[in-house]
UniProtKB/Swiss-Prot annotation:
Domain of life: Viruses
Record's GO cellular component terms: virion component
Residues spanning the membrane: none
Protein's name according to its UniProt entry: Capsid assembly scaffolding protein
Keyword flag Nucleotide-binding: no
Family, per entry: Belongs to the T4likevirus capsid assembly scaffolding protein family.
Keywords of the record: Viral capsid assembly, Viral release from host cell, Virion
């Protein structure tokens, strides 16, 4: 690697020629000259290694910044595309369901109107002592039975519609939460999730969520500042401890989380 090559080249530096010219006119013992030369050469090599590591650290830092920038752009594009596709998919499901159940919904409304009308006629017959022929009783009973069936079917369909609306609200809530906390740490995400747990999804949910996220960020700001101060090297020797840390790719994970939410809700349809 580049770092090892630069360090190896630094170790090959030979300062003996320069020292010979320096001590050429100086009367000094060979032992003292050799000792001084050893110390001088070691110092030169040490500074050369430090200089090489400093340049490598700057190059690595610039590369990491570029990678992080590209990762954020890719993550933003992926989440935007997934959200658009999921929104279209849910709209399509809702339209299909309304089309398939339009007849049943209409029948339910008509059944309620018929029940009201039939009840009014019954009261009218009783008030005016109108006697219904016996052969008509079966017809009325059948109509009442059919009416009851329509009422039950209508109630079932409306219950199913309410459940689907609840699922849609759930996935929109989860997407909003995932989008707002994508730049937070895991501990901060847990705090936000705990704080919004009792808040129902509504038009005001986004503003409440934003306020909670900002509050969590602010509460962790001082802690982050202290941590950065502790981790910042104060000496030149500490700056040489070049450590490469693995960066977790959160773009794919964030996209997979959103897809799993939509897939879970879509499976209920």
């Amino acid at each position: 690697m580049l770092k090892e090559q630069l360090i190896a080249e630094a170790q090959k530096i030979d300062a003996s020629v320069a020292l010979d010219s320096i001590f050429e006119s100086v009367n000094i013992s060979p032992e003292a000259k050799e000792t001084f030369g050893t110390v001088f050469e070691a110092t030169v090599k040490q500074h050369a290694v430090k200089l090489a590591e400093s340049h490598i650290a700057k190059i690595a830092e610039k590369a990491e910044e570029e990678v992080e920038k590209n990762k954020e752009e890719a993550e933003e594009k992926a989440e935007k595309k997934i959200a658009e596709q999921a929104s279209k998919f849910l709209d399509h499901l809702a339209k299909e369901w309304l089309t398939e159940n339009k007849l049943a919904v209409d029948k339910g409304i008509k059944a309620e109107l018929f029940e009201s009308m039939l009840g009014g006629l019954k009261e009218l017959f009783v008030e005016h002592n109108v006697v219904v022929p016996e052969e008509s009783v079966d017809v009325v009973a059948e109509m009442e039975e059919e009416l009851q069936e329509h009422k039950e079917e209508s109630a079932r369909l409306f219950e199913e519609l309410n459940k689907r609306d609840a699922y849609i609200n759930y996935v929109q809530r989860e997407v909003a939460l995932s989008e707002s906390t994508k730049d937070l740490t895991e501990s901060q995400k847990e705090k936000v999730s705990a704080l919004v747990e009792g808040i129902d999804y509504s038009d005001a949910f986004s503003s409440k969520l934003s306020a909670i996220v900002e509050m969590v960020k602010k509460s962790n700001k001082d802690e982050s500042t202290i941590t950065e101060s502790i981790n910042t090297p104060d000496t030149e020797e500490a700056g040489l401890n070049f450590v490469t840390e693995a960066v977790e790719d959160k773009s794919a994970q964030g996209a997979e989380d959103i897809v799993s939410v939509y897939a879970k809700v879509a499976s209920r349809f």
